[in-house]
Amino acid sequence: MGDSQYSFSLTTFSPSGKLVQIEHALTAVGSGQTSLGIKASNGVVIATEKKLPSILVDEASVQKIQHLTPNIGTVYSGMGPDFRVLVRKSRKQAEQYLRLYKEPIPVTQLVRETATVMQEFTQSGGVRPFGVSLLVAGYDDKGPQLYQVDPSGSYFSWKASAMGKNVSNAKTFLEKRYTEDMELDDAIHTAILTLKEGFEGEISSKNIEIGKIGTDKVFRVLTPAEIDDYLAEVE
């Protein structure tokens, strides 16, 4: 018997030891638009493709990079509606922590709480796993941090990572370009060059998004004008 007959059951392991619905969720991530993150010596940058379904869509209404707290931001590959649900849950968790302890939630703690939510959706009846992987960028007392969270609920800290349909090219490029002493501006240039690998069409401020956080511990999404400036620098 193969794994196929188990593919509709979330809570039953297949004979090969897989939860097939999680495999399908990872397929949804793998067919999503490319996103990446780079941890620099003095900050973190996350970036993503933003391909719109039609030229009639107002690009300003599509935001793939979101704040979770003033010093933590996130981006996804996979299903946008699932991302919205996780963003809402993560923000609520951060607000509860702030109310209870009167200090901002540490990056690791928020990542762990978000991963716990995702893991719970892999062992409950009547639900399905989230069809997204997240890259979470933050800066707290422990310095700059970058985490990736997958549909299974597993999470790891990364120096640089990528996900989505162009993941193999992007990771190969990052492995060649990444250095421990990379500054934030250099990381932004590297992020743009990584997105260019396998990018269909011409890259512009209308079809990519970039978020960054530095030593000021304020996460922000770059404006189209700022992205244009960085694009001009890497030409």
Swiss-Prot record:
Keywords, A to Z, come to: Cytoplasm, Isopeptide bond, Nucleus, Proteasome, Ubl conjugation
| Highest taxon in the source lineage | Eukaryota
One cellular component term from this protein's GO annotations in UniProt? proteasome complex
Query: Per the record's keyword annotation, is tRNA processing included, yes or no?
Result: no
Query: Is Isomerase found in the keyword set?
Result: no
Tell me, which GO biological process terms does this entry list? ubiquitin-dependent protein catabolic process
Q: By its UniProt entry, which PROSITE patterns does this protein fall under?
A: PROTEASOME_ALPHA_1, PROTEASOME_ALPHA_2
Cross-link Glycyl lysine isopeptide (Lys-Gly) (interchain with G-Cter in ubiquitin), where in sequence: K64
- Role: The proteasome is a multicatalytic proteinase complex which is characterized by its ability to cleave peptides with Arg, Phe, Tyr, Leu, and Glu adjacent to the leaving group at neutral or slightly basic pH. The proteasome has an ATP-dependent proteolytic activity.
Record-stated family: Belongs to the peptidase T1A family.
Q: How does it assemble?
A: Component of the 20S core complex of the 26S proteasome. The 26S proteasome is composed of a core protease (CP), known as the 20S proteasome, capped at one or both ends by the 19S regulatory particle (RP/PA700). The 20S proteasome core is composed of 28 subunits that are arranged in four stacked rings, resulting in a barrel-shaped structure. The two end rings are each formed by seven alpha subunits, and the two central rings are each formed by seven beta subunits. The catalytic chamber with the active sites is on the inside of the barrel.
NCBIfam families recorded for this chain? PRK03996.1 (NF003075)
Q: What is this protein called?
A: Proteasome subunit alpha type-2-B
Identify the species of origin.
Answer: Arabidopsis thaliana (Mouse-ear cress)
